[in-house]
């Protein structure tokens, strides 16, 4: 499965700025992975990784603004859409897909947003996919 997701926030803002500031790199070791590299990496995984029953579980221990999490959820949701037509089943499987993805970050604003350079955090970006 080769997927290129539409991540306008990531593509427009973060692709140009892989580093928010020298201070954040120094203090947090923070550097962002562009979505095209995320997709290249995820394309190396077998297709069964995207099934939702039983779901593969993913943990991103340095999730930043969620580029990996968004791409993983997008692939899982595409699998759901292509394997069931029933809206109620799709909804249940979409929630199962979301529940199988975990992200942690040292910086609360990466998760929650609210910084002038980072208004939308990983949490809201993930939830907007549903």
Residue spans for each PLM region:
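SAM-dependent methyltransferase catalytic region
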Residues: 1-130
């Amino acid at each position: 499965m080769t997927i290129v997701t539409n991540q306008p926030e990531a593509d427009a803002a973060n692709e140009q700025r892989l580093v928010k500031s020298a201070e954040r790199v120094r203090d947090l070791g923070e550097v962002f992975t562009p979505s095209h590299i995320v997709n290249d990496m995820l394309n190396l995984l077998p297709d069964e990784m995207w099934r939702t029953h039983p779901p593969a579980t993913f943990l991103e221990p340095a999730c930043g603004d969620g580029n990996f999490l968004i791409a993983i959820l997008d692939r899982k949701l595409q699998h759901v859409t292509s394997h069931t037509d029933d809206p109620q089943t799709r909804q249940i499987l979409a929630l199962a897909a979301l529940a199988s993805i975990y992200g942690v970050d040292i910086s609360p604003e990466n998760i929650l947003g609210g910084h002038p350079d980072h208004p939308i955090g990983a949490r809201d970006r993930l939830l907007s996919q549903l």
